[in-house]
């Protein structure tokens, strides 16, 4: 496969104004996408965004570039990433464009794409877009310029879709729910979904100002959610990230329920009802406890590379339906085409109602092993992951764990980080060993940096 210049594992992402996430590049990106998709015919693309202040600027740039290529644009406004995937399908668009940096803070933003079926763009199309970016921008004749329209009922359409993913007779009227929308794209959607299904909803993180997305709130910072669940005596807390494709839960006792536990709850219920359709996909970072819990049900478990893109690929290769990541990217391919935080939460809520069980009862069947994840800042992540000295340090630690744990090194696909994960039976030992390994890697990184030619 050809080397990508611009696209990462999940589109193009960076610091606004200090990377390719600037109006000049994004305008040309819109044009390049339009040229590749249009191919001489009239086409339509939908654009949605989260609540970052830079979204206005980037939306306008994309719109201008697409129009210059002769492509019509349907503007969705603030919309969760999975909502954009859904509306790309139902509006019969040729592609969907998401303006978001997901769980990152407001200084970052990104552009990612959905194909006409609501799935990820094929590699061949991404490479074609990159090739087009190297060409001189040329505007089509005025008579062929694209037009822009705003889809005023976009939120309502997606709300109805979310509600349709659980049985029509399911009512949440006996549940008190705290939902944290991370001051992001679900702020005007998630509370309505749950309240329209009858729940008593306590919403937080619903006052976006362009700068407070994911700021000490949402799925990556669940303390506020936990406190609120306890304070109001809620049955469950639902924490979404800035673009709504991740979810974590909090039970009535204040315990955090991560993506691995959510996958287990959904998969076990479908297995018991005979509708699981195959096995379950996790990732290299999924807790070993998930693998043990799933296989103990007699259900196959497969690990993919890290990233919802690879979870989706593995699910489609195997024709399975349920998978996801510890971080809360949960994919239910029998309901959606991509990870959807609201839909995943609804599956759990429906199970709670149907089985008349509290969330902590549903998680009782999975015991997670203590796991420590350290994000090591480095510009040499890929080099370190394959460095012989680093590999030997990992082997030494694995020997020390004596077969009762795992060690995983993974360069981030979007940030200058090496993710170091250590898993084992004893939490304090795992944390100590992870830090020792990171100290060793940092020393190797320092020597490696000194040996590299300066630029």
From Swiss-Prot:
Its cellular-component GO annotations read: cytosol
Does the UniProt entry include the keyword Phosphoprotein?
yes
SUPFAM superfamilies, A to Z: Phosphoglucomutase, C-terminal domain, Phosphoglucomutase, first 3 domains
> What is the enzyme's class at the highest EC level?
isomerase
Active site residues of this protein: 102
Task: List the catalytic activities from the record.
Answer: alpha-D-glucosamine 1-phosphate = D-glucosamine 6-phosphate
How is the cofactor bound here?
A: Binds 1 Mg(2+) ion per subunit.
Q: Which residues bind Mg(2+)?
A: 102, 241, 243, 245
Carrying Phosphoserine, the residues are 102
Write down the EC number.
Answer: 5.4.2.10
Q: Which domain of life is it from?
A: Bacteria
* Keyword Phosphoprotein part of the UniProt annotation: yes
**Which cofactors, by name?**
Mg(2+)
Q: Name one GO biological process term.
A: UDP-N-acetylglucosamine biosynthetic process
GO terms of molecular function: magnesium ion binding; phosphoglucosamine mutase activity; phosphomannomutase activity
Q: Which residue spans traverse the membrane?
A: none
Instruction: Summarize what the UniProt record says about post-translational modification.
Output: Activated by phosphorylation.
- InterPro entries, alphabetized: A-D-PHexomutase_a/b/a-I, A-D-PHexomutase_a/b/a-I/II/III, A-D-PHexomutase_a/b/a-II, A-D-PHexomutase_a/b/a-III, A-D-PHexomutase_C, A-D-PHexomutase_C_sf, Alpha-D-phosphohexomutase_SF, GlmM_bact
User: What keywords sit in the KW lines?
Assistant: Isomerase, Magnesium, Metal-binding, Phosphoprotein
User: Main role?
Assistant: Catalyzes the conversion of glucosamine-6-phosphate to glucosamine-1-phosphate.
Record family assignment: Belongs to the phosphohexose mutase family.
Protein name in the entry: Phosphoglucosamine mutase
